[in-house]
Amino acid sequence: MSPKKILLVAHDVTLAHLGRPLQLAGYLHAAGHDVTLAASSDSARFLYNFPGRTHTLAPTGKARFIENLAKGRPVFDFETLKRFAEEDEKLLAHYRPDVVIGDFRISLSASARRQQVPYATITNAYWSPDLAPRFIVPDLPMVRFLG
């Protein structure tokens, strides 16, 4: 397979949303692909050893995201999503990747379609209906008492 130009976009409102694309980007770079990883400046300290190219996104509004999530409100308002989409489209137009892979960048699916760039997303397995989790009950006295 010939090397591909791959853009990964980490919407790093939590460390997991950076860690997954960072790990995947490292594997793809080691496999010989031209990899760019985009994340906010809040994540710069985690990217200094990344061997590929990096791109700094506008701040993601972590504090507001966490507050909205905790209060059961929509995590992003329309204006924020619009701003993300505009940034996505500029990013895609600039790098023109063969594929873009996002982690919690909600706007990226629509932006990639508008720019005609194939899109994939990184999702935790526990969000899949195909996962049948096996819960192990710890062997504690309270468990024996309650059953």
Model-inferred region functions:
Residues 68-107:
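Conserved nucleotide-sugar donor-binding subdomain of glycosyltransferases
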Residues 10-22:
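A short, glycine/small-residue-rich beta-strand->loop->alpha-helix junction that serves as a flexible
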Residues 43, 100-115:
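An aromatic- and histidine-rich active-site surface loop
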Residues 118-147:
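Active-site-proximal region of nucleotide-activated glycan assembly enzymes
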Residues 38, 55, 101, 120-122:
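Hydrophobic/aromatic beta-strand patches that form the interior of the parallel beta-sheet core
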Residues 5-7:
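Residues that mark the start of a beta-strand
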Residues 25, 29, 113:
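Gly/Ala-rich phosphate-binding loop of Rossmann-like dinucleotide-binding domains
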Residues 3, 12, 30-80:
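Conserved nucleotide-sugar phosphate-binding/catalytic loop shared by glycosyltransferases and other
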